[in-house]
Every structure is written in structure tokens, then in C-alpha cells.
């Protein structure tokens, strides 16, 4: 335990908060071929591997994930939300931050309905999270 005088001289340092999505906080200057510190809400990338994996202990499923090489050169593992997808190797996708609790090492989500990732088909509720268009309603026309 420090003395009062030691605290007056030195002071306490605030603990630095670690980022939950560090790959979104790096940019890449392609002219100078150097990484830059630019934060982005989303980043574009190309799928290198699309596969399924099993979750941690109490849960059981086949979760769909993709390994994505981002425009800043970093390769990350991203979760593909929703039922069914059309992604394969070389698909261009947009990723956002957000981990999957039962998949270790998966810190990013692929945004459905943008670039090569199609929206979830026949989705009626929570459509905006899965890139599903509003269905043409025949009841409203009558």
C-alpha cells in the first residue's frame, strides 16, 4: 500500500481499457504500405475459409463462421448470423464488432444484406439485423 506522499509524487494510473474489436481500429495506407490508427465502425474483407464449428461446453450446434482477410491486412474470424447463407471463398463481406459468447476467438459479425452476403430469406421479425427486405403484402393493397 503506498503512502500518502508516494501518491502525491506519483499518482495512480488509470487502467487502459482493451478494445473488444481491435482489427476495426487499424487502417492501412497502401501508398506508404504502413498501418495507421483509424477507428472504423465496419470493415470490408474477403472470405478465405467458410466452415462450421461447435460451441463451448453446455451448448451444442454447428455454428457457421468465416475467416475474413480485411482491407487492412488483418485476418479475423467472423460469425455468419441467421439461417442459411450464400457465402463461399472469395466472397466480399462487411464485418462489424460483436463477439459470440459460446465461440472462443470469434469477435466479429458479418453484416447480412450488404456486398456478397445476401439477407436471410423469409425473415419477418427483426429483419434489419439480417438484411431481409420488407415483404410485399397483398393484404395492404386491398
UniProtKB/Swiss-Prot annotation:
GO BP annotations, alphabetical order: translation
Keyword set, alphabetical order: Methylation, Ribonucleoprotein, Ribosomal protein, RNA-binding, rRNA-binding, tRNA-binding
Job description of the protein: With S4 and S5 plays an important role in translational accuracy.
Family the entry assigns: Belongs to the universal ribosomal protein uS12 family.
Protein name, UniProt field: Small ribosomal subunit protein uS12
Known partners and oligomeric status: Part of the 30S ribosomal subunit. Contacts proteins S8 and S17. May interact with IF1 in the 30S initiation complex.
InterPro entries linked to this entry: NA-bd_OB-fold (IPR012340), Ribosomal_uS12 (IPR006032), Ribosomal_uS12_bac (IPR005679)
A single MF term (Gene Ontology): rRNA binding
Listed GO CC annotations: small ribosomal subunit
Biased amino acid composition, Basic residues: 9-19
Organism domain of life: Bacteria
Residue segments, region Disordered: 1-22
Amino acid at each position: 500500500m503506498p503512502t500518502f506522499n508516494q501518491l502525491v509524487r506519483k499518482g495512480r494510473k488509470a487502467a487502459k481499457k482493451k478494445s473488444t474489436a481491435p482489427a476495426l481500429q487499424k487502417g492501412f495506407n497502401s501508398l506508404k504500405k504502413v498501418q495507421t490508427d483509424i477507428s472504423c465502425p465496419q470493415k470490408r474483407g474477403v472470405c478465405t475459409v467458410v466452415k462450421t464449428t461447435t460451441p463451448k461446453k453446455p451448448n451444442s450446434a454447428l455454428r457457421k463462421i468465416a475467416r475474413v482477410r480485411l482491407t487492412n491486412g488483418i485476418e479475423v474470424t467472423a460469425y455468419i448470423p441467421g439461417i442459411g447463407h450464400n457465402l463461399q471463398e472469395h466472397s466480399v463481406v462487411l464485418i462489424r464488432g460483436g463477439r459470440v459468447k459460446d465461440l472462443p476467438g470469434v469477435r466479429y459479425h458479418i453484416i447480412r444484406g450488404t456486398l456478397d452476403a445476401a439477407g436471410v430469406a423469409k425473415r419477418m421479425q427483426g429483419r434489419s439485423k439480417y438484411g431481409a427486405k420488407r415483404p410485399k403484402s397483398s393484404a395492404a393493397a386491398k
